[in-house]
């Protein structure tokens, strides 16, 4: 397995040396023949929004329900329609113990005060305010977070009815498709997002925004005139909200099959060697920290950015950090509206099961531990996570994350446009 890491690290070093290092210095290429710029230009805001809107017809897509299964079927059909016809499914069982206690708004309005009443040692009103997951530290005001479990919190009767079915234990599936490389089909980057949600809304941001992003990248990379030297897998995980069960099932079932040619001599690799895993989870909402009253701004903040995270405590922290900065350089060169920043506290997302096996990063709207964990997104797991909640400024942040991933992956897999 270590050979995979050596291959990936060598590829990242070569890429930085050949081009992304220059982009990181801010020297953007205006070359009209640049295939990466052409591919990035094929990402359109209205198309991204339409794909996301399509997902919301299935409500919150809560795992173990008909609406979730219907959404998996719809995603597979959409992938096939855009040319990613090699769809497959991972099947696994999810049989949790029954929940104890009542429903309602878990974590909201209960517990000790979140914010200190005393000034900081230097006399400031608010400063360090505890720790978050993934090794993060929280600063500034916090607001309570939690999962809404009361269907009556959803005021839209039609949506409430759509989301009324409760999960049942049993078999689960998730779908992926693969763009096969022309010269190195046995090497692969995995691009993922989770398609399930909860909270009795539409799971538009968490994680319809990431799912739509991955589907849009599948559309562009599988266009008839696009070739890649290496393979790309587009994976839409299930059961993220219950503990990363879908991505964990993928790792458990597929990691030992990496690089095996089947049948021998066929040139076919059902599970190419993993070179990197890139997750996308909550892409739209960077409105800043809550104020003393717990209120978050209605508007995207001027300093909004895409957060690229790796986990500094993982076995492959150095390689994952290098991958993160490849994506940062791609953003510097090709993103149109918002910058990107790199942080070391990736956590609580579907790249976690991969992070000790292959270089792994996560792209998102905020830092997961320091920001999301402190309540920066008031719609997280809430009935207000609706398509209509977000504006074009929000959708553009998601599109900029798509531009970043597309540009980085296009260079890592050596994408070309046939006929140019």
Regions found by a protein language model. Name each.
Residues 369-420:
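His/Asp/Glu-rich mid-to-C-terminal helical/loop segments that flank catalytic regions of hydrolases
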Residues 8-19:
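Bacterial N-terminal signal peptides
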Residues 24-72, 76-77, 82-89, 179-181, ...:
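N-terminal hydrophobic or amphipathic helices/low-complexity stretches enriched
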Residues 237-350, 356-360, 367:
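Metal-dependent peptidase/peptidase-like ectodomains
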Residues 48-56, 87-89, 174-178, 188-192, ...:
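Structural recognition of the beta-strand scaffold that forms the well-ordered cores
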Residues 50, 54-178:
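A non-catalytic alpha/beta surface segment that caps or lines the substrate-entry region
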Residues 34-42, 56-67, 160-166, 196-208, ...:
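Second-shell loop/turn segments in exported
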Residues 175-177, 191-245, 405:
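Alpha-helical metal-binding/catalytic segments enriched in His/Glu/Asp
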């Amino acid at each position: 397995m270590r050979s995979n890491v050596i291959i990936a690290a060598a590829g990242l070093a070569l890429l930085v040396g050949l081009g992304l290092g220059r982009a990181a210095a801010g020297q953007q290429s205006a070359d009209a023949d640049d295939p990466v710029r052409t591919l990035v230009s094929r990402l359109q805001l209205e198309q991204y929004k339409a794909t996301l809107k399509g997902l919301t017809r299935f409500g919150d897509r809560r795992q173990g329900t008909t609406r979730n299964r219907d959404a998996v079927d719809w995603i597979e059909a959409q992938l096939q329609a855009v040319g990613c016809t090699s769809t497959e499914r991972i099947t696994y069982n999810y049989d949790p113990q029954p929940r104890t206690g009542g429903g309602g708004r878990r974590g909201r309005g209960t517990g000790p005060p979140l914010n200190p009443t005393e000034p900081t040692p230097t006399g400031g009103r608010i400063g360090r305010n505890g720790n978050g997951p993934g090794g993060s530290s929280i600063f500034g005001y916090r607001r309570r977070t939690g999962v809404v479990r009361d269907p009556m919190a959803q005021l839209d009767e039609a949506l409430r009815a759509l989301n009324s079915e409760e999960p049942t234990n049993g078999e689960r599936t998730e779908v992926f498709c693969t763009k096969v490389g022309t010269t190195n089909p046995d090497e692969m980057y995995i691009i993922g997002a989770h398609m399930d949600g909860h909270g009795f809304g539409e799971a538009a941001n968490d994680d319809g925004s990431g799912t739509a992003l991955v589907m849009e990248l599948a559309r562009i990379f599988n266009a008839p005139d696009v070739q890649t030297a290496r393979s790309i897998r587009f994976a839409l995980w299930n059961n993220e909200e219950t503990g990363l069960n879908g991505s964990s099932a993928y790792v458990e079932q597929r990691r030992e099959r990496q690089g095996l040619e089947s049948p021998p001599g066929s040139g076919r690799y059902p599970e190419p060697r993993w070179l990197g895993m890139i997750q996308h989870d909550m892409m739209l909402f960077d409105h800043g920290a809550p104020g003393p009253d717990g209120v978050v701004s209605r508007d995207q903040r001027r300093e909004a950015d895409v957060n690229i995270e790796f986990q500094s405590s993982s076995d492959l922290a150095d390689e994952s950090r290098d991958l993160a900065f490849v994506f940062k350089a791609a953003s510097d060169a090709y993103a149109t509206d918002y910058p990107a920043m790199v942080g070391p506290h990736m956590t609580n997302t579907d790249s976690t099961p991969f992070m000790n096996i292959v270089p792994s990063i996560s792209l998102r709207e905020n830092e997961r531990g320091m920001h999301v964990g402190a309540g920066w997104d008031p719609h997280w797991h809430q009935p207000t996570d609706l398509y209509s909640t977000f504006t074009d400024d929000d959708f553009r942040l998601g599109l900029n994350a798509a531009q970043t991933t597309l540009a980085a992956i296009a260079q890592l897999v050596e994408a070309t446009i046939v006929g140019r």
